[in-house]
Amino acid sequence: IMICSRLDHSAKGCILFFVQLLRSMYHLATSNICIIDSYWPAVSMLKHKKSLKVIQIWHSIGKMKKSGYQSLGKKSGRKPEFAGYLKMHKNYDYFIGGAPVWNKYYAEAFNIDESRILNYGLPRIDYLIKTQDSNRAKFFEEFPGLIGKKIVLYAPTFRKKMKSHWHDILRASKYDDIIIIVKNHP
């Protein structure tokens, strides 16, 4: 079962989100394993049966920004009271991480003991490596004028209440042989 839902703050969006929460509560009650890649209220806020194992695989590649408990009370983070009310990132039995060098930062961000972090690598990286050549070929087929140019991808992470600085980066690029591609966070 896969449940994907974002909170749309309209009345209809709130109702649909609530329906997804109820649906996920049913599946949490009837499953033995839950794999999650973000925060989900039904996982963190509810008490679950002992046989349920919750595995957090997170959705980023590595730990390059402060998030979760590391950013509480900061401009880009949640208010501590809000995080406490939502029991932010609670009930994870295991966390799948990349290299052990990131463990300290994952433990801080998710408020978990490092012994719960399993360094199995990140599935997303395997996919990107396996498809690298075909993705490159497709890209240059679509944009043949970029062959031979240096290409820089700027893909800023999402931060609420903070503006992206990609305009400044574009202005700083003074070289004709450098192409900057901006891909904003969804």
Language-model features and meaning:
Residues 1, 109, 119-186:
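Conserved catalytic-core segment of nucleotide-activated headgroup transferases in glycan assembly
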